[in-house]
């Protein structure tokens, strides 16, 4: 397995991004043959991810004061904003309507793969038990809004909202935090999970045991580029790692200082340095 150098990754990290409108233990990591990895949300994660692009417009998720939500479609040609429903007489306020989302989560996001829409509900960790105040969930829907599958993440798991969702070979890839309460103490584990679009099965794929946080920021070929946090001398240290999902190799690319940031744009990964310079 040829390792990619720091320079190679930072200069030529290719990813296909969804537009705004628009060591370690492994489970099942050796039978994957990926060569078309790409991002399906922005590298900044799920925050304010209310739109998903489409060839003729964009999908939008809008939440009401009741807590429930609907999917709308903004048509660029007709300049119309309509509920994603063929039932013109519907009030769009119950689960019989394909645009309706029943949710008690603390945040909703929407994204699109090649074949499906996904509604993502962001959970909130409880403070006193091994459950969530709100569960994280994933809804797989037809592009017309109809429900295909709906699953809740395990009760002690939340999406890492600062990381992107990636897709390839009919699977979604996303990072999670798994927490466990022991008396008054709490411990955390960090996993990469997959969701199979064909079978609807959610599976643990890779456990990050050498870092204390991991979030996807870019994807290309067989590689997921991760921004991670290490503990160095008891202090957190941000760094960039790569995970080869075909070989399960997880290797470090570089450290980041407190003043250095990464930004994904136009199929490249950019580094903003402390002297305010930007390098690809």
Label the model's feature ranges:
Residues 20-23:
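C-terminal motif of bacterial Sec signal peptides marking the signal peptidase cleavage site
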Residues 26-42, 67-94, 129-155, 183-208, ...:
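Surface-exposed loop/turn elements that mediate protein-protein interactions on large endomembrane-trafficking
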Residues 44-54, 95-111, 157-169, 210-221, ...:
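Repeated scaffold domains used in trafficking and secretory/extracellular systems
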Residues 59-61, 118-121, 173-176, 225-228, ...:
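Residue position within the beta-strands of beta-propeller blades
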Residues 9-18:
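Gram-negative bacterial Sec-dependent N-terminal signal peptides
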Residues 33-67:
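N-terminal export/targeting and maturation segments
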Residues 2-10:
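Bacterial N-terminal signal peptides that target proteins for export
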Residues 113, 122-126:
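Active-site-adjacent structural elements in enzyme catalytic domains
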């Amino acid at each position: 397995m040829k390792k990619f150098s720091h320079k190679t990754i930072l200069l030529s990290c290719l990813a296909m991004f969804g537009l705004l409108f628009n060591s370690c233990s492994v489970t099942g990591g050796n039978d994957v043959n990926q060569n078309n990895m790409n991002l399906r949300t922005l590298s900044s994660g799920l925050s304010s991810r209310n739109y998903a692009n489409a060839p003729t417009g964009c999908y939008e998720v809008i939440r009401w004061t009741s807590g429930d939500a609907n999917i709308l479609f903004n048509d660029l040609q007709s300049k119309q904003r309509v509920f994603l429903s063929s039932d013109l007489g519907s009030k769009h306020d119950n689960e019989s309507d394909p645009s309706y989302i029943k949710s008690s989560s603390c945040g909703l996001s929407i994204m699109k793969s090649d074949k499906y829409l996904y509604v993502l509900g962001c959970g909130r960790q409880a403070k006193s038990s091994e459950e969530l105040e709100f569960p994280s969930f994933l809804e797989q829907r037809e592009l017309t809004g109809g429900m295909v599958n709906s699953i809740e993440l395990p009760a002690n798991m939340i999406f890492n909202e600062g990381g992107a969702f990636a897709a390839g070979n009919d699977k979604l890839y996303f990072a999670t935090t798994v927490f466990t309460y022991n008396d008054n103490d709490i411990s955390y584990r960090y996993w990469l999970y997959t969701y199979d679009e064909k079978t609807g099965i959610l599976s643990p794929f890779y456990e990050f045991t050498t870092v204390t946080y991991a979030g996807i920021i870019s994807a290309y070929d067989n590689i997921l580029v991760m921004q991670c946090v290490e503990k160095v001398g008891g202090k957190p240290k941000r760094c960039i790692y790569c995970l080869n999902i075909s070989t399960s190799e997880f290797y470090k690319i570089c450290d980041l200082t407190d003043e250095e940031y990464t930004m994904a744009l136009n199929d490249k990964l950019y580094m903003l340095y402390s002297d305010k310079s930007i390098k690809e």
